[in-house]
Every structure is written in structure tokens, then in C-alpha cells.
Amino acid sequence: MSKRAFNFCAGPAALPDAVLQRAQAELLDWRGKGLSVMEMSHRSDDYVAIASKAEQDLRDLLDIPSDYKVLFLQGGASQQFAEIPLNLLPEDGVADYIDTGIWSKKAIEEARRYGTVNVAASAKEYDYFAIPGQNEWTLTKDAAYVHYASNETIGGLEFDWIPETGDVPLVTDMSSDILSRPLDVSRFGLIYAGAQKNIGPSGLVVVIVREDLLGRARSVCPTMLNYKIAADNGSMYNTPATYSWYLSGLVFEWLKEQGGVTAMEQRNRAKKDLLYKTIDASDFYTNPIQPSARSWMNVPFRLADERLDKPFLEGAEARGLLNLKGHRSVGGMRASIYNALGLDAVEALVAYMAEFEKEHG
């Protein structure tokens, strides 16, 4: 078998080697049953046990309170942009949104299709290089909810604090930083996360929702998008993304074996510190984000001369450092360093960066 590359893709992202090896071993014959998980009925006792264990492991990892439902749904995080207002925003209500980049803007645009949106703060004033402090926000007193993206995968901004919204439910898109460090779930009304970054493969979105927020869906809300129906049916109103759910469960097991989210925080801190230190110590590489708002998971950086982007990427790929090209809307480079990537991946990257700078700087 050839050596595994270091995959810095923003999503679908790297999965732990141990998880892939386990899935490979169980692919044709899951625990002596003579069939693959992909072939199981989602109603079977075996699959229900797989799904239930995955949920419990996630609850353990994030210490999710008992009055929260955990849903394993389809449609990805982008579908949640519509699902949230359909479930939580009354026709005559107002929802507050915080704009910190492309993904929060997409959420805002979609929510406006279903009701009144107040953009309570925007990082546009800072060219999306910093996050407005809460003292700059203009929140609506009786808003249906306050929505923000805890980490902007493309721009590389991340909240290092949780907003205070009083009795107004706080809703957050945690697609790219969930499970990267400890989290007080009780501060939120709803958390959602597309799986393909820190949870598992694509095709799945996890929603953690406080029970008192269920049953508020509008009459026009499609059955398949109604949180209460999903919760009442154990996320199996229809056939779920069974294999993605199973693989996510293997990731949760792996995370627990590694020491949980506390261990991940230490590991991720070491990775991001090394990469940002390398960028900041150089005149050849730059990252424009205010230090307090820098993402732990997605690190964008530019070279001194964009004409060097192509040879940089070619050299990186030759060394097994894959998917470092920045998003088309931003350009430059982006290293996504989710849980599955170890410190050795970042060490290999910064060694190459130093080598490339020495040759071209």
C-alpha cells in the first residue's frame, strides 16, 4: 500500500486512518453478520444499535444535556439555512443574524425567503478580517433567535467566545469546528454541523436542538424538514444516510479513544500555533485575520507573489501535501487542519513552506 497523503481539504476532509481501516475491515462482513452496514435495513436491531451508540458517544463527547435532542439528518448544513427559519421563525417574527463571511451570508439570504432578518452585526466593516465585538451588535429585543457561524471555513474567522443572548435562543453553524475543543452546549438553543469536516463523510448533518424549540414549525414546513417529526422518529422518518451515520459513529469512538475533546483542544492548539507562528515569522507568507479571530481549523495564507501559487501547489502535491488551494472566492492557500490531521501533517507543511520560501523568497 502506498503512503497516505496529508489531506488539507476543507471538506470532504481527512478521516482518521484508524476509522478507515476499521470500516475497510467491516465492509463486506459486519461483525460476522455476512453483510455490509450499507446493506442493512435501517429498522434492523443491528443498525438501530449502531445509530444509538453513535448518538450516545456524541452526547458523551460534548456532554449534551438530557433536554436536547440529537438529530442525524440529510441535506447538509446548507439545507439548515432554510430549515431553521421554517422551524423557529414565526411569520410575524424577526431573526437576528451575524455576518462574518460567506457561509453566514448564505444563511442570511436563505432566511430572508421566509421572514424578516435583522443583520445585527457584520464583519464587512473590518473587511471580514475581524469579528465585531458584541458591544457593536444591534440585537432585536424579542428576536425568534440569534444565528451566527462559529467558524467561517472560507475566510478563516472563528469566534473564540460564545455570544450572550439572554432568553433569545442562540443558533450556530458549527460545521467546521464542532468537536475541536470543549463546548458548553447548554448556552445554545440549536447547533448544527455538516458532517464532512470534523464528524465523518458527507451526506449527513447533525442537529443538536433544545426540546422546548420543537413543535414550532410553520404549517408550510415540509414534513421532511420538521425537527419535531425527525425527533419523534429517531431521525428515521425516512431512510437515513446509514453509512455516513455509521462512519460518524466510528469517528466518535476514535475521538473518545484519543481522550475526547479536551485532548483534541491540546492537539489542535499545537497545530494552529505552529502554522500561524510560521506564517507570522515570514515576510513571504501572510494571513490578514486579526489574531483573536483566527480560525483553529481553517488557515488561509497568501504568498508574496501570486504567480508562485501554481508552483507552490505543484511542489506540495509532489510531497503528499494535498488540497492546499484556497477557495475560489478568496484565492491564495488554505490549510484545513481538522481533528483527523495530526501535528505531523502541519510539521510537514511548515517544513515545505520554509523550503519553498528559501528557494523563491
Curated annotation (Swiss-Prot):
N6-(pyridoxal phosphate)lysine: modified positions: K197
Q: Which Pfam families match?
A: Aminotran_5
Q: In which pathway does it act?
A: Amino-acid biosynthesis; L-serine biosynthesis; L-serine from 3-phospho-D-glycerate: step 2/3; Cofactor biosynthesis; pyridoxine 5'-phosphate biosynthesis; pyridoxine 5'-phosphate from D-erythrose 4-phosphate: step 3/5
Any idea which positions bind L-glutamate? Answer: R43
Reactions it catalyzes: O-phospho-L-serine + 2-oxoglutarate = 3-phosphooxypyruvate + L-glutamate; 4-(phosphooxy)-L-threonine + 2-oxoglutarate = (R)-3-hydroxy-2-oxo-4-phosphooxybutanoate + L-glutamate
Q: What are the recorded Gene Ontology BP terms?
A: L-serine biosynthetic process; pyridoxine biosynthetic process
* Chief site of localization: cytoplasm
Query: Which positions are annotated as binding pyridoxal 5'-phosphate?
Result: A77, S78, W103, T153, D173, Q196, N238, T239
Keywords associated with the record: Amino-acid biosynthesis, Aminotransferase, Cytoplasm, Pyridoxal phosphate, Pyridoxine biosynthesis, Serine biosynthesis, Transferase
Question: Could you tell me which SUPFAM superfamilies the record lists for this protein?
Answer: PLP-dependent transferases
Q: Kindly report, in one word, the top-level EC class recorded for this enzyme.
A: transferase
Give coiled-coil spans as residue ranges: none
Enzyme Commission (EC) number: 2.6.1.52
Q: Where in the cell is it found?
A: Cytoplasm
Q: Could you say which cofactors this protein requires?
A: pyridoxal 5'-phosphate
How does the cofactor bind to this protein, according to its record?
Binds 1 pyridoxal phosphate per subunit.
An example of a GO molecular function for this protein is: pyridoxal phosphate binding
InterPro entries listed in its UniProt record: Aminotrans_V_dom (IPR000192), Pser_aminoTfrase (IPR022278), PyrdxlP-dep_Trfase (IPR015424), PyrdxlP-dep_Trfase_major (IPR015421), PyrdxlP-dep_Trfase_small (IPR015422)
Q: Name one GO cellular component term.
A: cytoplasm
Q: Which family does it belong to?
A: Belongs to the class-V pyridoxal-phosphate-dependent aminotransferase family. SerC subfamily.
Role this protein plays: Catalyzes the reversible conversion of 3-phosphohydroxypyruvate to phosphoserine and of 3-hydroxy-2-oxo-4-phosphonooxybutanoate to phosphohydroxythreonine.
What is said about its interaction partners and assembly?
A: Homodimer.
* Protein name listed in UniProt: Phosphoserine aminotransferase
Give the encoding gene's name: serC
